[in-house]
Regions:
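Acidic (Asp/Glu-rich) sequence patches and key acidic residues
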Residues: 1-143
Length: 143
């Protein structure tokens, strides 16, 4: 488990516990990619950052996951998340930025974690109405 803090109002929130950071990162990315086809992965991952790297930029620089048209190559032996974990070990991630809308969808899809997701959402103190593309800045600390 990890201690989670959310950046809000110029400071880090109180810690939120009860959720593994690797699970949060993988679930957030999977839930976003689930809504679209893998061909649209670059657009779908806009707003996601891991350890201050935009996920889309990091993968673009690597070059071997995309074909010459910029379309994601489906490698049969490894999933997108396994590929990402090889490039950025998710267990070592200290910061994660993700769209708030993705976390709201996750809250409705996973009733067993809805209370923890709601704590994270509430800690953001996001403006209402929330602007399109609004992202959470999350910091992880080991428990």
């Amino acid at each position: 488990m990890s201690k989670i803090r959310v950046w809000t109002d110029g400071r880090w929130s109180d810690e939120i516990s009860g959720l593994d950071k690797v699970y949060l990162i993988k679930t957030a990315i999977q839930s976003q990619l689930y809504l679209i086809s893998y061909e649209d992965a670059v657009e779908a991952l806009e707003g996601f950052e891991i350890n201050h790297y935009r996920v889309t930029d990091f993968l673009d620089k690597d070059g071997d996951y995309y074909n010459e048209d910029g379309i994601v190559n489906q490698k049969k032996e490894e999933s997108f998340l396994n590929y990402l974990n090889k490039k950025i070990p998710l267990s070592q991630v200290q910061s994660f930025i993700m769209p708030l809308a993705v976390l709201k969808v996750m809250k409705t899809k996973e009733p067993s974690l809805a209370a923890i997701y709601e704590k994270i959402i509430s800690a953001t103190k996001a403006p209402i109405p929330t602007p399109k593309g609004y992202c959470l800045n999350i910091k992880f600390e080991d428990e």
